[in-house]
UniProtKB/Swiss-Prot annotation:
Protein name: Succinate--CoA ligase [ADP-forming] subunit beta
A Pfam short name: ATP-grasp_2
Cofactor(s) named in the record: Mg(2+)
Species name: Acidiphilium cryptum (strain JF-5)
Statement: the UniProt record of this protein carries the keyword Nuclease: no
Length: 398
């Protein structure tokens, strides 16, 4: 689960992470009032969407204009900047061409920036460690730094069993070229950030940029926090921070039915049981010249109702031109899948090609249900056959 910058900063501040003063606003008038509460004379107005690259982005109705992060020198300028953003669609590298509608802005005090750095914490699942990453290339996308200047990314690993120690921050600080005063502030910042990361069950905490001020202070100029969805049951208070308007409606609907769904950019909808088989299915679709429209794992204990819901979610994507159902029935019974597919196809008046490959428990019963349904369902014998048939059917229907 992702949250907005202002929410992330409020949480991190409660654990001792240094952030600038700021207030959220939903209107231009509220933004001006927020500015009056700050020291000035410089203010920063930031669009609040679940995506990075806001400053370098552009608004759909003004592609040549200013981005989603703007400087202002008076409450009146703050109000004008906020009104120019609110209700408009901001397009960044991370939003894709569709962009995101700005529904709130964050008004923050200006800052005397001497240096811009990068700092993040994430989980290394392969090694069961928490990795702290830092770089002198603050303000840039870390993926771009990793590609062009991998030597500029510093890493230290922390064993969760023993926790963070002073040498972790010192090693990074020396690598970043911090002086003694800055090192002390940096160590305090890293320790507070680690404490928040562990206590809140985060998947990632990213500060980009982390700035060193003229006075030697270390402050989070931006903040991104993402939580481990599997741990949210331990944090009911964090659920209140969810902004469903920033999430894919299809993914929200899938979550209600305990389905693992991720929207992609292709045209072939996929419904599979098991994450590994789902990824293999997406790979073979690409092998035969098409692109998957989604990742969808119905799980091992799916019911007819869940399968029907999964089918509807796939078809709610206007980019879907065909559907491939690939089921290996171990715990999952093929007849249950078949009943769900038939029920959903009838309910939504299926208008795109559908290929179904079934194997495993009750496979013959499942095939009988499909063949007797009277629906134009294309049967496949194996994964390669299924991928070839759905790609061919989509091309023929085009």
């Amino acid at each position: 689960m992702n949250i907005h910058e202002y929410q992330a900063k409020e949480l991190l501040k409660s654990y001792g992470v240094a952030v600038l003063d700021g207030h959220v606003a939903w209107t231009g008038e509220e933004a001006a009032e927020a500015a009056r509460k700050l020291p000035g004379p410089v203010y920063v107005v930031k669009s609040q969407i679940h995506a990075g690259g806001r400053g370098a982005g552009h608004f759909k109705d003004d592609p040549e204009g200013k981005g989603g992060v703007r400087l202002a020198k008076s409450p009146e300028e703050v109000a004008a900047a906020a009104e120019a953003m609110l209700g408009n669609t901001l397009v960044t590298k991370q939003t894709g061409p569709a962009g995101r509608v700005v529904r709130r802005v964050y008004v923050e005090a200006g800052c005397d920036i001497k240096r811009e750095l990068y700092l993040s914490l994430l989980v290394d699942r392969a090694k069961s460690e928490i990795v702290i990453m830092a770089s002198t290339e603050g303000g840039m996308e870390i993926e771009e730094v990793a590609e062009k200047h991998p030597e500029k990314i510093l890493r230290v690993a922390v064993d969760p069993a023993s926790g963070i120690s002073g040498f972790h921050a010192r090693r990074l600080g020396f690598g970043l070229g911090l002086d003694a005063t800055q090192m002390k502030a940096f160590a305090k910042f890293v320790n507070a950030m680690y404490k928040a990361f562990v206590a809140l069950d985060c998947a990632i905490v990213e500060i980009n940029p982390l700035v060193v001020t003229g006075a030697g202070e270390v402050v989070a100029l931006d903040a991104k926090v993402s939580f481990d969805d599997n741990a949210l049951y331990r944090h009911p208070d964090l659920e209140k921070l969810r902004d469903e308007a920033e999430e894919d409606p299809k993914e929200l609907e899938a979550a209600k039915h305990s389905l693992n769904y991720v929207a992609l950019d292709g045209s072939i909808g996929c419904m599979v049981n098991g994450a590994g088989l789902a990824m293999a299915t997406m790979d073979i679709i690409k092998l035969y010249g098409a692109e998957p429209a989604n990742f969808l794992d119905v799980g091992g204990g799916a019911t007819k109702e869940r399968v029907t819901a999964a089918f509807k979610i796939i078809l709610s994507d206007p980019n879907v031109e065909g559907i491939l159902v690939n089921i290996f029935g171990g715990i999952m019974r093929c007849d249950v899948i078949a009943e769900g597919v038939v029920a959903a196809a009838r309910e939504v008046s299926l208008s795109v090609p559908l290929v179904v490959r079934l194997e495993g428990t009750n496979v013959q019963l499942g095939k009988d249900i499909l063949s007797k349904s009277g629906l134009p369902i294309i049967a496949a014998d194996n994964l390669a056959d299924a991928a070839q048939k759905i790609v061919a059917a989509v091309k023929e229907a085009a």
